[in-house]
């Protein structure tokens, strides 16, 4: 039973480490989204802070905004996909934790049954010893 429990614990730790990796990926995507937003704001601030803005720069800003919007949408899609993966992994972790708890309870129950059986056996031996002693004392 101990080997089974240890195997389930190892499996649970493995699932937990996979969840941590999933969450790291989510944080990485969120970081890329934040960096893109900061870059976009900095470029727009820099351009709009100029006294005179050439028409070509406005055209370039428009193209940049389109590309940045497309990239942000792609990152948001990736973020949702990664969050879904993390939720699925979180469910696997919960199932693994439940299996560990179940095996622990089974082990405890088996120990209680063993202890109770050992106690009954000890009582029977004590009763037999008492009866044997009592029988010897009252025969003679």
Give the residues covered by each predicted segment.
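Charge-rich amphipathic alpha-helical interaction elements
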Residues: 1-140
């Amino acid at each position: 039973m101990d080997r089974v429990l240890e195997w389930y614990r190892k499996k649970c730790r493995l699932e937990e480490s996979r969840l941590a990796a999933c969450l790291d990926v989510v944080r990485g995507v969120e970081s890329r989204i934040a960096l893109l937003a900061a870059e976009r704001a900095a470029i727009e601030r820099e351009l709009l802070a100029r006294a005179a803005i050439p028409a070509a720069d406005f055209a370039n800003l428009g193209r940049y905004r389109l590309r940045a919007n497309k990239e942000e949408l792609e990152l948001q899609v990736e973020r949702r996909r990664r969050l879904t993966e993390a939720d699925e992994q979180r469910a696997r972790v919960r199932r693994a934790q439940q299996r560990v708890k179940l095996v622990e309870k089974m082990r405890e129950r088996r120990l209680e049954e063993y202890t109770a059986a050992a106690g009954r056996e000890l009582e029977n031996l004590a009763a037999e010893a008492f009866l044997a002693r009592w029988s010897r004392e009252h025969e003679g």
